[in-house]
């Protein structure tokens, strides 16, 4: 009896200690890792580039400010956000029915669908991008099929423009959204849908009032992931886009490799990092609201 009482008291003390631990402390190792991997190298890059210029900080900042407010940078920022938004919306339209089909599949069908989604990630992104360049070229598969069907009289220009960038980026980023939506849809209790149908609700009404609201958290999370990855994309826009499709990552590469303007490149890198942190803060706030609302 005494041993049982001591063990029970020990469990209660252990439980109190566990409750007393702030969950924020559990994130400290991850935050330290992120600071060392992302923030510290960017800051080092910025201050080291300032030291190599031999100019004072105010002089460099004035020069950078004049460049940042130039039409080139402004157009790149607008273009980056616009392409990222279009890619996110197109990926959502394609990913939602795919994720829904996966959530309703079982056995071999589900396994094959997951393999088709994940398998491309075992191939280099450069190889996948070049594959799409071959498919979308003037003599590529798409134009050949359309010409054979008589739908077009001359090959379409699907490469080296915004359309090519959107197609290539959507293909690369689509699995992120599909898997996020699949996880969200898989957690929905099917009994809710059966109950709605048994009470006389139509399939469309059940989807609109029950199924879709329950998947909005996954939609928001997946779209945020795709948008964040899109704003920092480099390889696909560089290979499949044209001169008018200059994105922020491509400008950073140009400033580092061609003009050797490292301070400006580091400022734009910090700008990208700030956008990412803001978007993650929005997602964190949204997640907390979802938990509070049940």
For every predicted segment, state its role:
Residues 286-294:
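Short cytosolic juxtamembrane segments of multi-pass membrane proteins
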Residues 188-192, 292:
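Short glycine/proline-centered loop/turn elements that form peptide/ligand docking sites
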Residues 1-19:
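Short, Lys/Arg-rich, polar N-terminal cytosolic tail immediately upstream
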Residues 57-58, 200-202, 207:
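Polytopic alpha-helical membrane proteins, predominantly small-molecule transporters/carriers
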Residues 199-200, 213:
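Glycine/proline-centered hinge or cleavage motifs at structural transition points of membrane proteins
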Residues 19-54, 70-186, 210-234, 239-241, ...:
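Membrane-water interface segments at the C-terminal ends of transmembrane alpha-helices
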Residues 196:
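The alpha-helix within a helix-turn-helix
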Residues 55-69, 144, 243-255:
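Short hydrophobic, aromatic-rich alpha-helical segments embedded in or entering the lipid bilayer
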